[in-house]
Amino acid sequence: MLNPIVRKFQYGQHTVTLETGMMARQATAAVMVSMDDTAVFVTVVGQKKAKPGQDFFPLTVNYQERTYAAGRIPGSFFRREGRPSEGETLIARLIDRPIRPLFPEGFVNEVQVIATVVSVNPQVNPDIVAMIGASAALSLSGIPFNGPIGAARVGYINDQYVLNPTQDELKESKLDLVVAGTEAAVLMVESEAQLLSEDQMLGAVVFGHEQQQVVIQNINELVKEAGKPRWDWQPEPVNEALNARVAALAEARLSDAYRITDKQERYAQVDVIKSETIATLLAEDETLDENELGEILHAIEKNVVRSRVLAGEPRIDGREKDMIRGLDVRTGVLPRTHGSALFTRGETQALVTATLGTARDAQVLDELMGERTDTFLFHYNFPPYSVGETGMVGSPKRREIGHGRLAKRGVLAVMPDMDKFPYTVRVVSEITESNGSSSMASVCGASLALMDAGVPIKAAVAGIAMGLVKEGDNYVVLSDILGDEDHLGDMDFKVAGSRDGISALQMDIKIEGITKEIMQVALNQAKGARLHILGVMEQAINAPRGDISEFAPRIHTIKINPDKIKDVIGKGGSVIRALTEETGTTIEIEDDGTVKIAATDGEKAKHAIRRIEEITAEIEVGRVYTGKVTRIVDFGAFVAIGGGKEGLVHISQIADKRVEKVTDYLQMGQEVPVKVLEVDRQGRIRLSIKEATEQSQPAAAPEAPAAEQGE
């Protein structure tokens, strides 16, 4: 029989329910987690045996949103969910990052976590629910996992931290921060903020970590009740003799190699040392495992770099702990793009462009929480040549999507509001060289490219990656880490922001015991680095250009009477289509009567504005207009008087004598002066040529207010 084991608890303003034992009983563990009607079903399957020769930990996290959760049918051609969206990929990474460091060293059995969103309350984001579910399922499974973890979202509204704010509350919040950690320590932070201070950000991390303890306690209680026996897994015994033999052959040589400051040269030398060491040892004993020797050598490398940093010696490339690599900043490097920049920091380089488009270029995202439009796009590309390798080139991988989102978060806080700058903006960062922190180089490059494009960003932003090496109570925080320092260190800590505050913070911690004090030191050191980079960037460009690129569309905005919108659009869109073809512009009309005309040529925009003003102009009774004969009928003639408006000149109003035949007086296409006699309730216009000729001078079409140019 199905015997569900259920645990309920209050978590901030929400009620969380954990349920296991009901579904997916052939999986290693399965949990249904719900938080106020948002429910995520999370399963874990772990293989009891590792694949022979497996030398890394094969953990896969899949996060999938089902549209039935929101009571909808997919809008795709096949009416079925397809490959993961960008949002799903980012949440899969969010789940993966805090759980990965909690598996023991040497554990290489395959583990797969699948989180499926099966019900959604539009006010409760499923990401936190999925993270709690993954933590609970892994803890129940018996797989060696040093959890559980808790997860919390923290907002900052009216100078107060808010635990797990609703979607509506998030719109008012100056902060959107997700923090995950164990009972003892924070493991991961992912956030965007509206330029908050270091203390405010650190306070949010600490607040979120304290509040999530209730989740950890309840998962532990559930494990006592429903957990599976812990696997009897033991790491391979350490071969001390072999370790000593490898160290004797390679340690001194590797130590020397890590004094080579050039990355390519250093890599080449390290490869030579490793292959010579392995060849020597295999010649002595053919039964040795090459993979095992590689792992021992990697551990020696790690130890060499870490012990040198902790001893206060210069880093791999000769820098002190808080030194930034040499910077080279250039703007306007590509002639036809709307804005461009080349940002180089040591051996990391990003070519960044900014492109301006109209509102119809905005991305419409059909998400589970509802449809939304994004007018700021940020795409990050990491080609294999950037690290001197060959490889596949194609659609973006998880890492590229994640780095693009982080860089976007870094810039978002300074982007202008749509009503001040009515453009869709796309930033693309091409990483042309990489040795550490390419996502933060993308933030710096984006800030420069946006200024070069004339986008009125509120402030320049820069980003920096920090690292940490910690042994016991001894620790060193490193500024502007290299790729090697990232792999061999204990923390990766990326901070982006302006002179006034932080716009994005991302932290991944690989060890336990990172205290509030260490995070404080890292944040303060990052601020110094950020201000240094901003100083160099400001020498290249210190404010957005006064004008947008001549190749970018200029958006002119005019207001019309909302009642006249139907006249500008016409039947089935006929008038607006004809207008765009005639004037060579893009025209967008909003419900409140705001009309946006986009054109690369100012004359075309003026022509479009003039035509719209003609169409929407009010017809004045008693006024004389110059019109054109469009139709001749037995009882008179129809005359167009501009703006798509047409009136009837009755046969009795053509001349001041009796008219037998209209065509004796009027021809098709003939221009004639006409006086407006009447506009009836249906908007029908009565005209007179007879009375117009009595008045000497015809009037032009009525004037409308001049357009303002949105630049």
From Swiss-Prot:
GO terms for molecular function: 3'-5'-RNA exonuclease activity; cyclic-di-GMP binding; identical protein binding; magnesium ion binding; polyribonucleotide nucleotidyltransferase activity; RNA binding. Changing R83A: No effect on RNA-binding. No effect on degradation of long RNA molecules. Impairs degradation of short RNA molecules. Residues 622-690 form the S1 motif domain. Magnesium. Can also use manganese. GO terms for biological process: mRNA catabolic process; response to heat; RNA catabolic process; RNA processing. It catalyses: RNA(n+1) + phosphate = RNA(n) + a ribonucleoside 5'-diphosphate. Mg(2+) binds at D486, D492. Changing R100D: Abolishes enzyme activity. SMART domains: KH, S1. Its main location: cytoplasm. Its EC number is 2.7.7.8. Residues 327-331 are annotated as: Interaction with RNase E. Residues 689-711 are annotated as: Disordered. CDD domains: KH-I_PNPase, RNase_PH_PNPase_1, RNase_PH_PNPase_2, S1_PNPase. Residues 553-612 form the KH domain. Keywords: Cytoplasm, Magnesium, Metal-binding, Nucleotidyltransferase, RNA-binding, Stress response, Transferase. Residues 77-80 are annotated as: FFRR loop. Belongs to the polyribonucleotide nucleotidyltransferase family. The S1 motif domain is important for trimerization and RNA-binding. HAMAP family: PNPase. Component of the RNA degradosome, which is a multiprotein complex involved in RNA processing and mRNA degradation. Interacts with RNase E (rne). Homotrimer. The homotrimer forms a ring-like structure with a central channel, where RNA molecules can bind. RNA molecules bind between neighboring subunits. Might interact with YicC. Involved in mRNA degradation. Catalyzes the phosphorolysis of single-stranded polyribonucleotides processively in the 3'- to 5'-direction. Also involved, along with RNase II, in tRNA processing. RNases II and R contribute to rRNA degradation during starvation, while RNase R and PNPase are the major contributors to quality control of rRNA during steady state growth. Contributes to degradation of some small RNAs (sRNA). This is Polyribonucleotide nucleotidyltransferase. It comes from Escherichia coli (strain K12).
